[in-house]
Curated annotation (Swiss-Prot):
Modified residues (N-acetylmethionine): M1
Highest taxon in the source lineage: Eukaryota
Family according to the record: Belongs to the ribose-phosphate pyrophosphokinase family.
SUPFAM superfamilies: PRTase-like
SMART domains (alphabetical): Pribosyltran_N (SM01400)
The name this protein goes by in its record: Phosphoribosyl pyrophosphate synthase-associated protein 2
GO molecular function annotation: enzyme inhibitor activity; enzyme regulator activity; identical protein binding; magnesium ion binding
Role description: Seems to play a negative regulatory role in 5-phosphoribose 1-diphosphate synthesis.
Entry's Gene Ontology cellular component terms: cytoplasm
Keyword flag Thylakoid: no
Name of the coding gene: PRPSAP2
Amino acid sequence: MFCVTPPELETKMNITKGGLVLFSANSNSSCMELSKKIAERLGVEMGKVQVYQEPNRETRVQIQESVRGKDVFIIQTVSKDVNTTIMELLIMVYACKTSCAKSIIGVIPYFPYSKQCKMRKRGSIVSKLLASMMCKAGLTHLITMDLHQKEIQGFFNIPVDNLRASPFLLQYIQEEIPDYRNAVIVAKSPASAKRAQSFAERLRLGIAVIHGEAQDAESDLVDGRHSPPMVRSVAAIHPSLEIPMLIPKEKPPITVVGDVGGRIAIIVDDIIDDVDSFLAAAETLKERGAYKIFVMATHGLLSSDAPRRIEESAIDEVVVTNTIPHEVQKLQCPKIKTVDISMILSEAIRRIHNGESMSYLFRNIGLDD
């Protein structure tokens, strides 16, 4: 596992105040690796807690030490059973609240349901609902990483620190990709162009944008709500009304804006889950002359048969952080590499507990990052 260690953070982190308790809210042991790394860096023991499933599938949490008057940090990494993961977190937060904890800080590197942060058809904004549930349960602060949409921070009525994984991914590119100076940063769609531009400017590299790919779930075209109503129902409202309709979108044939011929292509995004768009982008880049293709993302959900499809694809390497456990996927696909981000989470915990400024962790981060 690739790990970045800035010189100023090489020594064990100094917890100057007492009263810190670190819990892992996961009942799944494979999801506790990140918690153990954070505890080791902080030089503290994991708090004593039992999280398990009853035979009737109900979640039960038993806190086995006093948290009265203490700063409680609850680390929750998302497993495949995301709904169980959420219930484990909510029950543990509420248990700490009713046990008179001084503050309850959630450390949730990947915020679940973050893709459902916009209204879809007759659905709902689920990430807003989840934020309200966490606040109601008793969460007083949230530490997360690379939210799918930064606007999700506004769903909370508590402080939210949205950390960035890009410094770790940038250093991986510089240290682990030979001849990265001959690379071009690629956005697989115009929606991810800002992230690609941020990487390109920091690495002093060129940028390419793929446009015209198949319609994705983030676009306006799939929003099935009709307000104003569709043409066939307009006449039923009032015969004298003539409300203009928005012209439907038509995507052009797939196009690569930028030169990738004879270059290393590095596709950057925040999440890699369903790999269809990444595989299509890789095929297009190969056709345009790219001789090596990397994919860099913060959160590696890698659902379903994603590892097998990546292994059989034109992609040479997929680099993700350990915000989400993916050891099984790595066994299925040797192309998947991991960057450890436990250091920045540990430092955030230390600073919040000691009452120090968090600005150090947001150096050189702009509005578009």
